[in-house]
Amino acid sequence: MQGKTVVVTGAFGTLGRAVAGLAAAKGAKVAMLDVAVRPDNPVRDAIALAVDLTKLDATTEAMRKVREATGRIDAVLNIAGGFVWQTVAEGDEAAWERMFALNLKTAYNTSRAALPHLIETSGAIVNVGANAALNAGAGMGAYAASKAGVHRLTESLAQEMKGRVRVNAVLPSIIDTAPNRADMPKADFSTWVKAEDLAKVMLFLASDDARDVTGVLLPVMGRV
């Protein structure tokens, strides 16, 4: 990753911080995009931008700023997203709209906005799907459906950009985060996917070592 520019969305969450920190440690210039910029930035000299990724115009402008500041964009890691547990019978339409906006629309907007820059560098996109989108449990409908959309976006865009931009996705089970621990206090946290380990997989897919890998939906299950 030495000398490359890596854009991380959802960059101030647990996984985003892990990815941004590891990318910087590998020598990349890092741009951290999130709905709000926090003062406790884990990456010195990172470009930090507050942007509403559900808005294509705002996302396009953010990519322009990154390209202008660094001279290139080599990889985009789409981590921005959200989760809700809600049954169809007792839930509401707003939750479905929110999941599709946070999980699928952000991935689409970021990918579309970055494509002109990624084509210049023969770059890579790495999305975050979900194992739950392969086999959804009760209450997971809105979340799983939106993540299934991320899977199909990944596959379709990989075909469209074949030979120009690589597009892959990781499909984690449960990521070990403070909110997940709070929501599932009786679970065995030791079986969950560590953010640092998932970051390594994502940065491999973004790197030249994965130059022949595109259109892949890669499960990262931990020991769940």
Model-derived regions, located:
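Substrate-binding pocket helix/loop in short-chain dehydrogenase/reductase
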Residues: T87-V88, D92-F100
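Active-site-adjacent segment of SDR/Rossmann-fold oxidoreductases
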Residues: N135, S156-V165
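Conserved NAD(P)H cofactor-binding loop of Rossmann-fold oxidoreductase domains
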Residues: I79-W85
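Conserved glycine-rich cofactor-binding loop
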Residues: F12
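C-terminal helical subdomain
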Residues: G163, A169-V170, T177, K186-V224
